[in-house]
């Protein structure tokens, strides 16, 4: 299982790298959809929603946020909900999943703050970026 998870993480990162070079409106949403594909291929239901007009997010910040999402998407059992919310000062990306894994660790860098919580079954993680 651990080897499969590691392969899924790298497959999601490759998909994200390919999505980074696409000229798409809303590159973060586009990259998260590419990362979600790996979970969907395992039968995990992934729902990605946006709230508000998302600001431009630098590539290095998008990479950290999508790495956080990949960590959750590759360990989810059956469902993940991703919500991207535009904030006056940046963006918040919230993920809720039935993942048994511990929350991903993130070094405080690039103005990103990571919060998490867990109930019996679900893991909630929010990455908040401030410009």
Model-derived features: positions:
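DHp/HisKA dimerization-phosphotransfer hairpin of two-component histidine kinases
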Residues: 1-47
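Short, non-transmembrane amphipathic alpha-helical segments
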Residues: 35-38, 65-69, 73, 103-113
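Conserved catalytic submotifs in the C-terminal HATPase_c
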Residues: 49-55
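Conserved ATP-binding N-box helix of the HATPase_c
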Residues: 56-81
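Short beta-strand/loop element within the Bergerat-fold HATPase_c
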Residues: 81-90
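Short active-site-adjacent structural elements
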Residues: 90-92, 103
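Acidic ATP/Mg2+-coordinating residue in the GHKL
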Residues: 97-98
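ATP phosphate-binding glycine-rich loop and adjacent ATP-lid/helix-beta elements
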Residues: 101-130
């Amino acid at each position: 299982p651990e080897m499969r998870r590691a392969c899924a993480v790298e497959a999601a990162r490759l998909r994200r790298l390919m999505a980074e070079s696409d000229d798409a409106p809303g590159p973060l949403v586009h990259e998260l959809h590419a990362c979600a594909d790996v979970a969907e291929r395992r039968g995990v239901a992934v729902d990605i929603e946006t709230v508000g007009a998302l600001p431009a997010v630098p590539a290095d910040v998008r990479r950290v946020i999508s790495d956080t999402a990949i960590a959750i998407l590759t360990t989810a059992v059956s469902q993940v909900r991703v919500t991207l919310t535009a904030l006056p000062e940046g963006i918040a990306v919230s993920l809720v999943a039935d993942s048994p894994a511990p929350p991903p660790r993130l070094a405080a860098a690039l103005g990103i703050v990571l919060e998490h919580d867990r109930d019996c079954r679900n893991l909630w993680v929010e990455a908040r970026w401030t410009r």
